[in-house]
């Protein structure tokens, strides 16, 4: 049975004026029309839910775990939450990430989330010839991103738009090679309604493709 995990990386989780949220809501409406009624869809809102960051508590916990030492209550709590996030991610086989573009990169909470799921021996492993992804079982990834500028004109802005490069590289590294991005871009320089309509068409096609794979 297919399980879809929505990863909402917008700081204003349910802001209906947000372009990326509008495009996501349109995608979800279309997607639900294509998939069976009993198919599971879960959602994690990174700016509402607890998503641990790598800080001194996490580093201390990892060091103690490696040495077989007892964790403090705080360390135990944070590592349990990180494990919950990891297992939720691993249990899905279709992913949808929703994000705005912030200073040419992903929102900070999405980076924290990536640090929770990129775990050796869980989503990748080390070998004598290099690291190998452990999620090579046909998983699919859709990224829905909104931006005021345009980043596909093969110019300076294309070079410094790191969010797409980072996400694609990291998920490919984990073994998720079916990766697609839908950009609602140019909202500050183009007709916003035209940008939305173009993105709506793209996510409708993406919804059909993901549901029928």
Curated annotation (Swiss-Prot):
This protein's UniProt keywords: Flavoprotein, FMN, NAD, Oxidoreductase
Binding site for FMN: 18-20
InterPro entries membership: Flavodoxin_fold, Flavoprotein-like_sf, FMN-dep_NADH:Q_OxRdtase_AzoR1, NADH:quinone_OxRdtase_FMN_depd
Reaction equations catalysed: 2 a quinone + NADH + H(+) = 2 a 1,4-benzosemiquinone + NAD(+); N,N-dimethyl-1,4-phenylenediamine + anthranilate + 2 NAD(+) = 2-(4-dimethylaminophenyl)diazenylbenzoate + 2 NADH + 2 H(+)
Pfam families tied to this protein: Flavodoxin_2 (PF02525)
Cofactor: FMN
HAMAP family in the cross-refs: Azoreductase_type1 (MF_01216)
Subunit note: Homodimer.
UniProt cross-references to PANTHER family, sorted A to Z: FMN-DEPENDENT NADH-AZOREDUCTASE 1, FMN-DEPENDENT NADH:QUINONE OXIDOREDUCTASE
The name this protein goes by in its record: FMN-dependent NADH:quinone oxidoreductase 1
Gene: azoR1
């Amino acid at each position: 049975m297919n399980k879809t995990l929505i990863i909402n990386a917008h700081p204003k989780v349910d802001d209906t004026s947000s372009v990326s949220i509008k495009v996501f809501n349109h995608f979800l409406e279309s997607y639900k029309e294509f998939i069976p009624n009993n198919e599971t869809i879960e959602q994690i809102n990174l700016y509402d839910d607890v998503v641990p960051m790598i800080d001194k508590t996490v580093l201390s916990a990892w060091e103690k775990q490696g040495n077989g030492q007892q964790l403090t209550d705080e360390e135990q709590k944070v590592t349990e939450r990180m494990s919950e996030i990891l297992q939720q991610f691993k249990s899905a086989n279709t992913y949808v990430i929703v994000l705005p573009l912030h200073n040419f990169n992903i929102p900070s909470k999405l980076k924290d989330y990536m640090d929770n799921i990129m775990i050796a021996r869980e989503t990748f492993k080390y070998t004598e010839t290099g690291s190998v992804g452990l999620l090579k079982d046909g998983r699919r990834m859709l990224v829905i991103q909104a931006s005021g500028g345009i980043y596909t004109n093969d110019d300076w802005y294309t070079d410094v738009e790191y969010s797409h490069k980072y996400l694609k590289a990291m998920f490919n590294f984990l073994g998720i090679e079916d990766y697609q991005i839908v950009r609602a871009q140019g909202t500050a320089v183009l007709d916003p309604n035209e940008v939305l309509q173009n993105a709506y068409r793209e996510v409708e096609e993406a919804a059909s493709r993901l549901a029928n794979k």
